A protein has these predicted regions:
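Polybasic, lysine/arginine-rich low-complexity segments
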Residues: 2, 26-27
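C-terminal motif of bacterial Sec signal peptides marking the signal peptidase cleavage site
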Residues: 21-24
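Conserved positions within compact, well-structured domain cores
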Residues: 27-237
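Bacterial N-terminal signal peptides that target proteins for export
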Residues: 2-13
Length: 237
């Protein structure tokens, strides 16, 4: 009888242990968010914030207002309202790089999906500090930090062995930019720019920049007409 009891207990215990291991080893479900156009993005936790791990592709604001698609250089540089485009006016760049937006689109405060927003300068600084940047450097402009840019860059796609580690999960791709002064497209593979929602002045919007030949992160103000990429951050609860 004792032998039977012991065998019965073992038969109960072993499946229980396997179940516990399965539960403890189960990966967390990925975080996703869907925009007004139905594009779904992966997101990641960086520090205490949840960031999109991809560039925004939306062609409408979250109230369903259309954003104007502008291929023309002359129209782009005369902007006084929200514009967007694809790099080199090639829609095949949408899937990988997302859309380039001027700062007028950012300032609508409706560019990101509901419950998300374009990160402020302070929120970008919080990201950078979570990767080891000092407060003094985070508060500065120009090239700042040590290897935070490398941690933000993707592992592929950067020129001349300039790939990052993507240790942050930000996965910054080298998507280039659209210049606000002539409307031209430049430097895909070498640089990428992201708007913040914060203005440096009435005519300049603050942004972040990553370069193939830099491990730091660049912060400065730029013409509001410039075409830069956008990430979204989840609203705090």
């Amino acid at each position: 009888m004792k032998i039977i009891t012991r065998i019965s207990l073992i038969n109960l215990i072993i499946p229980g242990l396997i179940l516990i291991q399965m539960v403890s080893c189960k990966k967390e479900d990925p975080i996703t968010v869907t925009d007004i156009d139905g594009n779904t993005y992966y997101a990641t936790t960086i520090g205490n914030q949840i960031w999109m791990a991809e560039n925004l592709k939306a062609t409408r604001l979250n109230d369903k207002t259309s954003i104007t698609l502008v291929p023309s250089n002359s129209t782009w540089i005369s902007a006084t309202k929200p514009f967007y485009c694809w790099f080199s006016n090639d829609t095949s760049n949408k899937a990988l790089y997302g859309a380039l937006y001027n700062n007028f689109a950012v300032q609508t405060e409706k560019l990101c999906p509901s419950g998300w927003h374009v990160p402020s300068n302070d929120e970008f600084k919080a990201l950078e500090k979570s990767l080891g940047m000092s407060q003094v450097e985070a508060d500065s402009l120009g090239w700042r930090g040590t290897d935070q840019g490398k941690k933000m860059k993707s592992r592929t796609g950067w020129n001349n062995n300039g790939n990052g580690t993507n240790k942050s999960g930000f996965n910054g791709l080298a998507g280039g930019y659209r210049y606000g002064m002539d409307g031209g497209f430049y430097d895909r593979g070498a640089v990428s720019f992201w708007w913040t929602s914060t203005k440096k002045s009435a005519t300049l919007g603050l942004y972040r920049r990553l370069d193939y030949n830099q491990n730091q992160v660049y912060a400065e103000g730029s013409n509001l007409k410039g075409g830069k990429y956008v990430r979204c951050v989840k609203d705090s609860i």
